[in-house]
Swiss-Prot record:
Protein name, per record: Uncharacterized metalloprotease HI_0409
Any Pfam family hit: Csd3_N2
Record membrane topology: Single-pass membrane protein
Major localisation: membrane
GO CC aspect terms: plasma membrane
Species whose genome carries this gene: Haemophilus influenzae (strain ATCC 51907 / DSM 11121 / KW20 / Rd)
Protein keywords: Cell membrane, Hydrolase, Membrane, Metal-binding, Metalloprotease, Protease, Transmembrane, Transmembrane helix, Zinc
Lineage: Bacteria, Pseudomonadati, Pseudomonadota, Gammaproteobacteria, Pasteurellales
Family: In the central section; belongs to the OapA family.
Localization per Swiss-Prot or TrEMBL: Cell membrane
Length: 475
């Protein structure tokens, strides 16, 4: 925070302190006036009024008689004003006692005590400051704005070591006394917590931690896909991590890239509230997408990961071979293989299975047909499948393709017949396995499977969550 901003905050608080002092003195005057009126309203305590009431005074007889004597001026008196002045000098100073204040009603005494405390604090305070922490700030950086040094910082950090690890966005409010010593520090740690440090008479500080209680509420957010599922989920407040996890759980059930505009979805979230205000903390418990007349779910388990309704990650998982039965490997995966036709060193990015022409080729896992094409100078007729976002499989030298681009396939479904097209030494199937675009050995790669890693008890708890998600996200 710029120094100018701190100065403005200090001046603004000074004005409020002056207003408090003014209110205090006005209240004192009003109370004193009320006390004086109360005293005067008691006739029995005033000798003048009691004399009139007793009848001791009679009607003045103004007729002269022989026993009366005329008033003679006093030769020693200097003036009438002197006599008045003498009388004034004899009057005692009027003082309010605690007994007079005790006669006030209780609510008036409470109000007076409150005003006295406020005025005392306002008089003692000379400077007030505020600051919002930025990245890399330390407590010393904060307090130096008001002229304090390490001698004020170290006792606070010794009392609360967490003051040595400030986070951007946290706020501080602090007060200096008339001697420019730190008297009060308020640290807004988060929306749910604040810590107060007050200086005692011995110079040490005491700490008070105030925690606000929050509540978590489950809510359903509904929407329709506009540009893409990811952007639509982001508009609903989901962060990048949550979107990625949900996409990973759904990608094996439905082709996310082919979801059309207007596709409906519903999200089950739990959110934290302070009163009626969101704290920004929340969790996505489940997601439903309705496409092609079917509902697809991603439900969070106790381990924080998302699975389909059966607790599976990849539906039926991957098979090791793209054939109905195991076949002989005629050429293994080899990044430095010499091509048998061209004679040049050329990486062999897959495995060749020696099979007769027309042998059925099957999908090793659920997926989508990404490409069907023909390359005369190499792969011949080939098919490429995509399995989620990470995995691709490629099948070359085919005699016939049985699928079309964009088509969804299931594990074990026939996708082509083996052949001898392109540059080939004889009938065989060339099979490649790619992870994030990089070819790996199909026979040794660790295949992604269906196991969730959940125990029997965890799976039972997960299925309870599934039923709750289905009930709350029901279309």
């Amino acid at each position: 925070m710029p120094v100018q901003h701190v100065k403005l905050a200090r001046d603004r608080r000074k004005k409020r302190a002056y207003i408090k002092v003014g209110v205090f003195f006005v209240a004192i005057l009003l109370i004193l006036t009320g006390i004086l009126l109360t005293i005067k309203s008691k006739p029995e305590e005033n000798s003048i009024f009691s004399t009139f009431d007793s009848g001791e005074y009679h009607e003045l007889n103004t007729s002269p008689n022989e026993n009366s004597t005329a008033l003679q001026p006093d030769e020693n008196a200097t003036s009438y004003d002197d006599e008045l002045q003498a009388k004034d000098d004899e009057v005692d100073e009027v003082k309010l006692s605690s007994d007079d204040l005790d006669t006030l009603p209780q609510h008036a005494q409470d109000a007076l005590n409150g005003l006295l405390d406020a005025a005392d604090q306002a008089i003692r305070i000379t400077d007030q400051f505020s600051y919002t922490v930025t990245e890399g700030d330390t407590l010393k950086d904060v307090l130096v704005l008001s002229g304090l040094d390490d001698s004020s910082v170290q006792p606070l950090i010794a009392l609360d070591p967490e003051l040595a690890h400030l986070k951007a966005g946290q706020q501080f409010y602090w007060i200096l006394d008339k001697n420019d010593n730190l008297e009060y520090l308020n640290w807004l740690v988060s929306e749910k917590e604040e810590r107060i440090y007050e200086r005692l008479e011995d110079g040490k500080f005491k700490r008070q931690v105030i925690e606000k209680k929050s509540i978590w509420r489950k809510e359903v957010l509904k929407g329709e896909i506009q540009n893409s599922l990811n952007s639509s989920l982001r508009e609903k407040g989901l962060d990048t991590r949550q979107i990625s996890q949900l996409s990973n759980a759904l990608q094996w059930q439905v082709s996310l890239r082919k979801l059309k505009k207007g596709t409906q979805f519903a999200i089950l979230v739990s959110r934290e509230y302070l009163g009626d205000k969101l704290t920004g903390q929340g969790n996505v418990e489940a997601l439903r997408i309705s496409s092609g007349g079917k509902n697809y779910y991603a439900v969070q388990a106790a381990n924080g990961r998302y699975y389909n309704q059966q607790g599976e990650t990849l539906g039926k998982g991957f098979a090791r071979y793209p054939l109905q039965r195991q076949a002989r490997v005629s050429s293994p995966f080899n990044p430095n293989r010499r091509h048998p036709v061209t004679g040049r060193i050329r990486p062999h990015k897959g495995v060749d299975f020696s099979v007769s022409q027309g042998t059925p080729v099957i999908a090793p896992a659920d997926g989508t047909v990404e490409k069907v094409a023909y390359q005369a100078g190499g792969a011949g007729r080939y098919v490429m499948l995509r399995h989620g976002r990470e995995y691709q499989t490629v099948y070359m030298h085919l005699s016939k393709s049985l699928v079309k681009a964009g088509q969804t396939v299931k594990k074990g479904e026939r996708i082509a017949l083996s052949g001898n097209t392109g540059i080939s030494t004889g009938p065989h199937l060339h099979y490649e396995f790619h992870i994030n675009g990089r070819a790996v050995n199909p026979l040794t790669v660790k295949l992604p499977g269906t196991s969730s890693g959940m125990t029997s008890a965890e799976r039972k708890q997960f299925l309870v969550r599934v039923r709750e998600a289905e009930r709350m996200l029901k279309p």
